[in-house]
Each structure stands twice: as C-alpha cells, then as structure tokens.
Amino acid sequence: MTQEATKPNIQEPRAERYNPHAIEQKWQGQWQESGLYKFDENAPGEKFYALTMFPYPSGNLHIGHWYANVAPDARARWLRMRGYNVLFPMAFDAFGLPAENAAIKNNTNPATWTYANIERMTGQFSRMGTMIDWSRKFATCDPEYYRWNQWFFIEFWKRGLAYKKGGLVNWCPKDQTVLANEQVVNGHCERCGTAVERRNLSQWYLKITDYAEELLDFSATDMPEKVRAMQTNWIGKSVGAEVTFDTPAGPETVFTTRPDTLMGATFMVLAPEHAKVKELTTDEQRAEVEAYVAAAGRKTDVERQQEGEKTGVFTGSYATHPISGHQLPIWVADYVLVTYGTGSIMAVPAHDERDFAFAKKFDLPIREVIRAEGSEGMGDQPSEPYSGEGQIVNSGEFDGMPGGKASIAAIIARLEERGVAKAKTTYRLRDWLFARQRYWGTPIPFVHCEKCGMQPVPEDQLPVKLPENVAFTPTGQSPLKLDEEWKTTTCPCCGGPAERETDTMDTFVDSSWYMYRYLSPNYDGGPFDPSKAGLLPVDLYTGGIEHAILHLLYSRFWTKVMRDMGLTTQSEPFARLRNQGMVLGEDGEKMSKSRGNVVDPDDLVREYGADTVRAFLMFIAPWELGGPWDPQGINGPSKWLSRVWNVFFEEKVSGPEEKMQGADVRFAVHSALKKVNDDFERMSFNTIISTLMELTNALVKAKRSPVFGTPVWEEALDIFNRMLAPVVPHIAEEIWHERGQKGSVHTAQWPQVDEAAAVRDTVTIGVQVSGKVRGEVSISKTASQEEALSAARAIAEVQKHLEGKTVVKEIYVPGRIINIVAK
C-alpha cells in the first residue's frame, strides 16, 4: 500500500469554517477503501501489539466503549507514526446469556441477533475513527473459532486439567445455570443480580489450582498494583500446618496458619457439608444438626463469610487435642467452608475474631496462649481477641517462644517430630467451574457411552456445532438436552450408541485465548499459526479493572497451559496492562437506563462530530480514573477544533499585533511536542489535549506576529498537523490534504523534538513595586541580580511608580519575581 493510495480526488473548494460532518464520513470511507490500517507483519519497524478488550455485541456501542477505545487508539496511532509496526485488531465476545435471552424475547435465533449487532457495532467503531485492522475480525460464536475452544478442552482433559465431579455449586434461579465463584457478587449473580442458591450437581471443572503458585508470580507482566492485589487476594495463599486430632469418626486434620496457637484450641468446627458431620452427630443432636445443615445449604459462600451474628450447632461429639489430650467439643457452623483447607478448623477464640465471636455466643472456653509484649494478660473475661505477635504462654514446652512468624517453623518442626502435624500451603482459589446449562455457548466435545464411559469427540469431527432449531426457554437443563436428534450420536471408541454432553462451556473460555487468534484469524491448522508467534505477547492491553479476577486471571492461566503444551514460549499473555476508569452519569452514578443518565455517543457524533467526542473523552478526566459526564464540557473541545481549523486556514486574525519572535514560536511548538511525547508514554491523555489547546493559543498569537508566513511558521503548522493526527484523525487528515501534502498524515513520520528549541534561554518574570505588579521583563536565565534590577528599572511603568520615592529594598528571586520596595 502506498501513501498516495490514501489521497482522494478532492475537487470541491475548502470549507471556510470547520465542518466535521463534511469530512469525517469521507475519510472513513477513504481509509477503509485504501486499507490504510491493515497490518503488514513484514513491514519495517519494531512490532507493537496494542489491544483493547473486545466488546460483547449487545446492540450498540455506549459511551463506555468510546472511553475505553479512543485513548488507546490515539496511542496506537502515535506509535505507528513513530515508526512502530502496530497491530491493533478488534473482534467480538459473542457467546453469552444476553443473546439467548433476546432470542427468547424476540422469538429468533441467538445467532441472528448477535450477527446483526456485530454488523451495527462494526460500523459504529468505524465512525469513531479508529485505526482497527478489520481484516482480522472474528466473533467467538463462529464455529471456526469455537472449534479451538473444543480442541483446547480435550487437550486440557488429556493433561488432567479438565475433569467432572459432583458437588455443591452456585445456581442462578433466573438464568437457570451454574455460576463460578468469581461470578457471584455479594451473594448475587453478577450478571442479573438474582440471589444465588446452592445445588448439588455433577459439573465440569478446569484445574486452575494446579497453577495457583505460578499465578502469584507477576514478574513477567506489568500490571497495576490494584489488579495484582485483587488476584493475589483471590488466590489466597496461606502457609501453615495441618494438625491431626482424633475424633469418634477417625482422625480429622485441620489447617492453621498459626500453629503457635495450637494450645489455645478449645473447640473444633466443621463445615455443614463436611463428610464426617453425619457420623459425628449423636442421636440426641441429630434433628438440630440436620436442620442447620439444610439451612446452611441455602446460603452462598459469600453470604456465609459476611460479618454478622455467628450461628452453629453442637454435634454431641468431642475431638482429642493432640498435645494436651483435652476433649474439645465439635460444632458445625457455616462460617467454615468445606472448600477451604480441609473443611474443618481448630477454634482458637483468644486469637481469632470469628472464633472469639462464636465462643462468646455459645459460652465456650477462651484460652490465652499469645501475650502481647508488656501486657498482663487477657484475664477471665476478655473483651476482644489478640491476633498479633508476642510471647507464647500457657503452652507447656512452647512457653517463652516468640509468637507469630518468628517461631512457626520451629513449632511445626517439633509437631512433625511428634507425628501430629506437617507443614502445608493452601490456596483459597478453587478450580474453575466450567459448564453451563444454556444454549448459546461452546458445546463441550464429549460423548457418554454406557460401554466405554465418557469419551472425547475425535479431532477430525470438530467443531461440534450448535443445532439451529432449539427451544431456548430455561428449564434448569441445557436446551441441548431437549434436542434428541442433536444429542444422539455414536461412540468414537466402540461405534455403539452414545449421547453428547449437553452442557456448554463458560463463555469466559472465549476471552481466555482470543488475543492469540488475531495473529492468524483464518488459520485452520491450530488455534493460531505458530509462525506468527513473534508478534507475541500483547505489548499493551487495556480494559476495565472489573475483569481482574475473571478474564484477566483466566487468560493468564490459559497462557501458562499453552506454554506447557508447547504452543508459545510466553508465560504471560500481556507484557503490560492498564485499566481505564469509568464515565459516570451527570449525577455521578453509574450510567443505566433505569436512572435516565445514559449518554448516547451516536447523538454526540451527529451534533459535534467524532473528533470532538474523541477529544472530549480524552480531556474529561485522567483516563485511569474516569469521572462524571459534563454535558456542557464538550463545547470546549468543539470550539477548540474550530480554532485549530482557523489557525491553518483563516487568512486574517483580529487583535493587536504580537511581538513573538521565531524562537518563541519554535519554543512553543517543540516544548509542546516534547510534553505530548512524555504524556503518550505515561498515558496521560487529558494533559495531551490541554497541551494541544495551549499550543493552539500560542499559534493564534503567532499568526498576529512577524513570524506569520515565514519558514518558522510553516514548520510550526507542519508539526502541529502531525501532532493532531493521533487524537483527532479526521480533521488532521483534512488539513494535511488541504495543505497539499501527499499520502496520509497517518503514515507520515512523527516530528522530532529540537531539544535546543524546547528550552528557553530567557525567562519572563513579573516586576513589582512595593508588592504590586507593574510590568514584566524578559532576561537571561543566568542574569545577575544587578542585570535583572537594571532591566526592571528601565520599565516605564516601574519608573512612574518610583518617581519621588526612596527605594528601601530590592528583592530578586531568580526566575520568579523582582520586587522594588519604595517609600
């Protein structure tokens, strides 16, 4: 592609005033027709893979999509002009419940609804003025894409990373499907807000826990501290010991991070789902325990972990303390989770808040074994637990040892010698619950044969495609289960009758590896063409922090498995991640139709043009923070672009003549260029816009100075034109061609900073007489005090206010102020 290919045959005269609607559609068509933004991997320049999180095709791009995309688009454009070979693709995350629910509502197929939305949103992205390479577009609901979801799943299964088991799961009664722990927010479905129930079902899981420790290592990826903290907390690594207690149902092992408090254990607590609850419950306690277990089963893990009054019930049985031999009552309580540790705990109420609250509620013993330095002890009726470090007391052979980290290793070693404990590391992270009981997702590529059991579909039969004529009404079973023709098949092992797996995959599978598919979206020999691996990893990935423990964690896990499969040498999918903030409603609340505070970007484009909307969204707030929408604020960028147009094309500028020199203009241009470069590096987009606005003001002044029309002026316009290109691409392209330039401004070279011009040799400072400003003077930065004062005294206004007075003091602060005090 040549630069000349992007130059249109423009016959019409130039508009006297800036008219975005006359130029934006024209240039969008020219760019698309010429293939201006198509990525050529063989083009010169260092590769840079820039990627924004792909959207769900819900119908229309909202203002949040614009906010998330225009700033990274501007940065990608800037990199391209600097000589990088930039890959900037886009696709659609197309599977999911909204499409299925829309199909139910509109009596259509989810595919029909989804592909219509994709076509509409693709056009909206183009009207945004992005440099997206649409030749790499795909939708995750394309069979050519989800074929590789199925291939991956079988490969995971071969490696022992995919398995099926029964157990308690989160269930959304509205969406009629299971949810992963990460999809439950405060006890409610993160998508529809319905209170989540617990059900016992046989489900598919992916063994993400095998990678828990490696997922805590962020050394190969540059992620914001908040994202690292969220993932670290979600993985929940705990280092401690497993201690074994004898019970009437056999040995019971508990996990503790504080083995130094072992002698403070005064009771044991089991999770309601613990396998030994039934055996440990005495006949006298059975009815009460069974009722409690049933009630706990109706709560989610999140609800059980919330602060509130503790509940529980005594089983009637006792455990034997492994050191003291004391009998500890065994209770059942829902604040203990069967999924954490072993599902049972040794309760140390003197040194744990939850155990303390439970002991107080049920009048159980509290035994102090860690005493704070300088403390006289808790006494018989402690008011609160002590969870800090200190000195071990009331613990026999351990007395006098320091509590906490300083002694834990030594205590574990002693307990191991006695055969009652062993060192152990646990993680709160649970395996990824992977199956869903809905239609619009990737079919799980397994069949069930009564003779051969569960078998994977052979690779040459992939993809297992979704059937088209299916009843979508949710019943609690997958709609695929109701399609007898589709689910009836043959066993790949024995050739006998078999039934397809009718659950579909969690749609987060689609976004776990999609960044690899962009490398070769039409490749049919694997998930991606291995010869394109040199484009990896994604150099800059941008998107919302709300994905920190879902998409971002899953994609890191997926890449590590791909590495172990030999598909990539990378351990992380993204070299660098940055999160944008959120554009809120004018009222400061999250935008929603119910609140009536939604801003439609299409309306804004129709009124102001895409470049104005782009500039305003970059200017409105620091990009990483976001903020409330300001309906009046967009007028500022709109007026600014009109002034930009006038700088280039208005022949006469009203106002007094300015005394700017060539050095002044070059300083304004090159210092602005230097700052814009720094701000693009830092992703400080709001200050980029403000710097360009300041430069516009300087050039308006320069147009009223002797510099106007000189080579310095022409250089200034050329550099300014290029500086505009990344942030307001349409007006920059129009200006480029109206000025007679060849090719496209977007393939032009980014200007070089003249470091000498970007630094002033002189400084302008205010001159005061007795504290009141009476003028200003331009002097050398290295001027002496006498030189500065001499220049100040030469100002007519200063002389006027000194006339007839006696100077009593002269103050000179270099680079800042001159003050002559007179009486």
Curated annotation (Swiss-Prot):
GO BP annotations listed: leucyl-tRNA aminoacylation
CDD domains according to UniProt: Anticodon_Ia_Leu_BEm, LeuRS_core
Origin superkingdom: Bacteria
InterPro entries linked to this entry: aa-tRNA-synth_Ia (IPR002300), Leu-tRNA-ligase (IPR002302), Leu_tRNA-synth_edit (IPR025709), M/V/L/I-tRNA-synth_anticd-bd (IPR013155), Methionyl/Leucyl_tRNA_Synth (IPR015413), Rossmann-like_a/b/a_fold (IPR014729), tRNAsynth_Ia_anticodon-bd (IPR009080), Val/Leu/Ile-tRNA-synth_edit (IPR009008)
SUPFAM superfamilies membership: Anticodon-binding domain of a subclass of class I aminoacyl-tRNA synthetases, Nucleotidylyl transferase, ValRS/IleRS/LeuRS editing domain
Subcellular location: Cytoplasm
Reaction catalysed by this enzyme: tRNA(Leu) + L-leucine + ATP = L-leucyl-tRNA(Leu) + AMP + diphosphate
Single GO molecular function: aminoacyl-tRNA deacylase activity
A single cellular component GO annotation: cytosol
Binding site for ATP: 593
Record-listed E.C. numbers: 6.1.1.4
Residue span of motif 'HIGH' region: 55-65
Residue ranges of the motif 'KMSKS' region: 590-594
Family as reported in the entry's similarity comment: Belongs to the class-I aminoacyl-tRNA synthetase family.
Organism name: Deinococcus radiodurans (strain ATCC 13939 / DSM 20539 / JCM 16871 / CCUG 27074 / LMG 4051 / NBRC 15346 / NCIMB 9279 / VKM B-1422 / R1)
Keywords carried by this UniProt record: Aminoacyl-tRNA synthetase, ATP-binding, Cytoplasm, Ligase, Nucleotide-binding, Protein biosynthesis
Major site of localization recorded for this protein: cytoplasm
Protein name listed in UniProt: Leucine--tRNA ligase
PANTHER family according to UniProt: LEUCINE--TRNA LIGASE, MITOCHONDRIAL, LEUCYL-TRNA SYNTHETASE
Disulfide bond annotation, renumbered to this chain: none
